Swiss-Prot record:
Entry keyword set: Flavoprotein, FMN, Oxidoreductase, Pyridoxine biosynthesis
Cofactor dependence: FMN
GO molecular function: FMN binding; pyridoxamine phosphate oxidase activity
Protein name from the UniProt record: Pyridoxine/pyridoxamine 5'-phosphate oxidase
Organism (species): Bacteroides fragilis (strain ATCC 25285 / DSM 2151 / CCUG 4856 / JCM 11019 / LMG 10263 / NCTC 9343 / Onslow / VPI 2553 / EN-2)
Source species taxonomy: Bacteria, Pseudomonadati, Bacteroidota, Bacteroidia, Bacteroidales
Length: 235
């Protein structure tokens, strides 16, 4: 992760005399990475084993939102888009998350299933970057997870036209109240437009911060026979 690529243009408001604030020099903001390193001899043959270890270490370290990941998709026109989503399962070698299928990411994935996932654990000076292909999970699996969600989250999933223009927050609240009234005393059903994606990875990179920006980076690439090739990358 680099903090050196920043705008220092003199016309930037960060260098101006903002009302009630002082100028900020972004180029001077940096930190040294001292938490440790990553050695070739410590790498397992399967990257999912290392990911599991790092994720559990992030959870044990009480990192904020340890399952948060930046999900990248691309529109049919080639326009990239990212957003933060929570990892909800890692099953059979696949990374699973849930969302609105009619959202921007859902419409992207319907046309182009290639996807990227990035985990950043600042407190541990670690990142994991994943590239793969997304596919919808079976409806039964989405139903099972939906039933585990808090009641109000289930109602919200039913009424939110995710990624589309909304007249006002009050309209969203009215829709929520009306939908909740429809399900009093009944099990809230999963709407057809909401469900899970399973990401099958073919490229996983592990990044560990090191002193002097000489970071450790190791890339796992999936091979035709199902094995993973490991190689060190320059920082």
């Amino acid at each position: 992760m680099s903090t050196d690529h920043v705008s220092t243009h003199p016309d930037s408001p960060l260098h101006g005399n903002g009302i009630g604030s002082e100028a900020i020099n972004l180029a001077a903001i940096r930190q040294e990475y001292t938490k440790g390193g990553l050695k070739e001899g410590d790498l397992p043959d399967n990257p999912l084993s290392l990911f599991n270890r790092w994720l559990h270490e992030a959870i044990d370290a009480q990192v904020d939102e340890p399952t948060a990941m930046l999900v990248g998709t691309v529109s049919p026109e080639g326009q990239p888009s990212t957003r933060t989503v929570l990892l909800k399962d890692l099953h059979d070698g696949k990374f699973i998350f849930y969302t609105n299928y009619e959202s921007r990411k859902g419409t992207h994935l319907a046309k182009n299933p290639y996807i990227s996932l990035s985990f950043v654990w600042h407190a541990l000076e670690r990142q994991v970057h994943i590239e793969g292909i997304a596919s919808k999970v079976p409806a039964g699996e989405s139903d099972t997870y939906f039933r585990q969600r808090p009641y109000k989250s289930r109602i919200g999933a039913r009424i939110s036209p995710q990624s589309r223009p909304l007249k006002s927050r009050m309209q969203l609240i009215r829709n929520f109240v009306a939908e909740a009234a429809r399900w009093v005393g009944r099990e809230v059903e999963r709407p057809a437009h909401w469900g899970g994606y399973a990401v099958t990875p073919h490229r996983i990179e592990f990044w560990q911060g090191r002193a002097n920006r000489l970071h450790d980076r190791f890339l796992y690439s999936l091979q035709p026979d199902g094995s993973w090739q490991k190689e060190r990358l320059a920082p």
